[in-house]
């Protein structure tokens, strides 16, 4: 049975709620036990971007398990996401489970696509600009679609039409 939950908040109440939640989430105590900690370990934009994408890819399930598995995954990348990706270190990854249904084969596939993006654009931010993600009414979905298209192009004819 599905119920629709409707909450009527004034603009002021909504602002208060969002400010309260932002303060809670942006605290060191919350960050220490949340996957958001992983991109914060890095200072270079590409390392932050790759760590954020990888952490978000496996961020489903128990937070403690997600953090443990993300820590292991970044260790597999020698804690140098961009260098590891550009150097194709992922080709030597042993077949193993990364997190739940995400395996080394999935990670290799993902990093191959990210390598393609970083070689062509230098950063995910520049890729997003080139793809005009900012014009989308749903930028997160548009970015995911653009990344998936890049992954698809690794294995199909050079026609982007095949990867729409």
Identify the meaning behind each predicted range.
Residues 48-52, 67, 105-112, 141, ...:
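Non-catalytic, well-ordered alpha-helical scaffold segments
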Residues 61-65, 77-84, 121, 125:
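Amphipathic alpha-helical interaction segments
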Residues 2-15, 119-134:
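Long, acidic, intrinsically disordered low-complexity segments
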Residues 155-164:
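Single conserved hydrophobic/aromatic residue that forms the stacking wall/gate
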Residues 40-49, 100-106, 138:
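Structural motif
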Residues 124-151:
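Hydrophobic, well-structured mid-protein blocks that either form specific transmembrane helices
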Residues 79-119:
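Hydrophobic/aromatic-rich structural module bridging two neighboring secondary-structure elements via a short loop
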Residues 2-58, 64-67, 71-74, 78:
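Charge-rich, intrinsically disordered N-terminal extensions
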């Amino acid at each position: 049975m599905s119920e629709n939950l409707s909450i009527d908040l004034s603009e002021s109440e909504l602002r208060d709620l969002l400010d309260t939640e932002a303060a809670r989430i942006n605290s060191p105590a919350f960050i220490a036990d949340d996957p958001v900690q992983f991109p914060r370990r890095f200072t270079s934009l590409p390392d932050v971007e790759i760590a954020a994408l990888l952490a978000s890819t496996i961020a489903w399930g128990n937070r403690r398990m997600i953090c443990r598995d993300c820590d292991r995954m970044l260790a597999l990348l020698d804690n140098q996401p961009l260098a590891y990706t550009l150097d194709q270190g992922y080709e030597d990854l042993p077949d193993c489970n990364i997190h739940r249904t995400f395996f080394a084969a999935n990670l290799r596939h993902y990093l191959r696509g990210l390598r393609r993006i970083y070689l062509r654009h230098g950063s995910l931010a520049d890729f997003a600009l080139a793809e005009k993600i900012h014009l989308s009414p749903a930028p997160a979905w548009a970015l995911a679609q653009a990344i998936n298209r890049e992954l698809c192009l690794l294995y199909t004819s050079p026609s982007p039409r095949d990867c729409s």
